[in-house]
Design a protein with these regions (language model features):
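Conserved alpha/beta-domain cores
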Residues: 34-348
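Acidic/Gly/His-enriched mid-domain segments of enzyme catalytic cores or analogous surface patches
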Residues: 8-45
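Conformationally flexible catalytic loops at phosphate/diphosphate-handling active centers
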Residues: 1-9
Length: 348
């Protein structure tokens, strides 16, 4: 007996033998999606800019598919987030320093005329290493990200040395620290990065370029610490996935509460507005790399709030560039103002 299935990726639903009228509606939506994709592809090689001509940097979240990422090279402004944990997760043990050098060199050289941001090892919670199992009652609030690598500094030093060695010839590296919750962690990471730099220079016998340093802003505590961050780092990258999760106290991987996870919640938008305001005030380079960056529903609001550096998955690049070229800055600012006045997501 044949069944008709509809997979709705937007709603996270699987429909079995839907009513004919509902099936017809989904077929219409598929046709619209295909038409929009064709329109977007026509713009994908044009510069990412607003109607006013102001440029917006469209960057790539990378680490999953090198072949696909290389094909996008001419369409993007660089790598906004390279997930270094992916190679760690695919092996049966920690990759050696030499293996990591080769991995990072490949990415830095593939985009040698563009900035490449490598995030240090970000495991724990939903990203586990098979050879370093972590069992916790509340992993989202547990041992993860920079907490792990600062507790085991040898892992951090090996990785940073590999990054610095890989960058010696190209000089296009930025380093991004994940899950930062305090100034102490940044200071300790900076000390270790300086130490790694000295060790690499002793090893190769000449001075190497120092990378730009940034932090993932994904823990609410750091939203209020931008004045203290300004003298310590070069940029912040807002990780909207975890920031939303922590602001709303919702585990997005828990099916009982996942429907409450909402990037357009007024509290999330107000936090993003505060971050953009303080970043400009204190002269911090502002970036955003969560799912919101690739969501056309969110992009206009982000532009209105002042975000001009968006990093997204490859499938979103064409549509976001298509949308950006049609955004009127005054309309975007008005939309963001109205959104900040909203009391509920439905009003946004």
């Amino acid at each position: 007996h044949r069944r008709t299935l509809v997979v709705d990726g937007y709603r996270g639903e699987l429909l079995v033998d839907p009513e004919p009228v509902l099936l017809q509606e989904y077929q219409r939506l598929i046709s619209e999606e295909n038409e929009l994709s064709k329109l977007a592809e026509d713009d994908v090689n044009l510069p990412a800019q607003l109607k006013s001509g102001e440029r917006v940097k469209v960057m790539l979240n990378a680490g999953l598919s090198p072949e696909h990422e290389e094909k996008l090279g001419s369409r993007i402004d660089g790598i906004g987030l390279y997930r270094t944990e992916i190679p760690f997760m695919l092996q049966s043990g920690f990759p050696s320093e030499e293996e990591q050098v080769a991995q990072y060199q490949g990415m830095l050289q593939m985009f040698n005329d563009k900035p490449v941001t490598l995030r240090t090892l970000d495991v724990g919670a939903d990203k586990q290493l098979p050879y370093m199992p972590i069992s916790e009652e509340n992993p989202c609030l547990g041992w993860r990200g920079i907490r792990i690598t600062l507790d085991q500094p040898e892992i951090f030093l090996i990785q940073v040395r590999a990054m610095l060695r890989a960058n010696a010839a190209t000089g296009n590296l930025s380093i991004l620290l994940p899950m930062v919750t305090s100034i102490d962690e940044i200071d300790e990471a900076r000390r270790l990065i300086e130490r790694a730099g000295r060790e690499v220079e002793e090893m190769i016998g000449y001075a190497i370029p120092r990378p730009r340093l940034g932090v993932m802003l994904e823990v609410p505590s750091m939203v209020f610490m931008l004045p203290q961050l300004a003298s310590r780092i070069d940029f912040i990258s807002v990780g909207t996935n975890d920031l939303t999760q922590y602001l709303l106290a919702v585990d997005r991987n828990n099916t009982r509460v996942a429907s409450m996870y909402d990037s357009l919640h007024p509290a999330v938008l107000r936090a993003l507005a505060m971050i953009a305001h303080d970043a400009e005030r204190f002269g911090i380079d502002l970036r955003l790399c969560g799912e919101m960056a690739g969501d056309p529903m969110c992009v206009t609001i982000l532009i209105g709030l002042g975000y001009r550096h968006l990093s997204m998955n490859g499938r979103s690049v064409a549509r976001v560039k298509y949308l950006l070229r049609r955004i009127d800055i005054e309309e975007a600012q008005e939309l963001s103002r109205r959104s900040l006045d909203a009391q509920m997501t439905a009003e946004v």
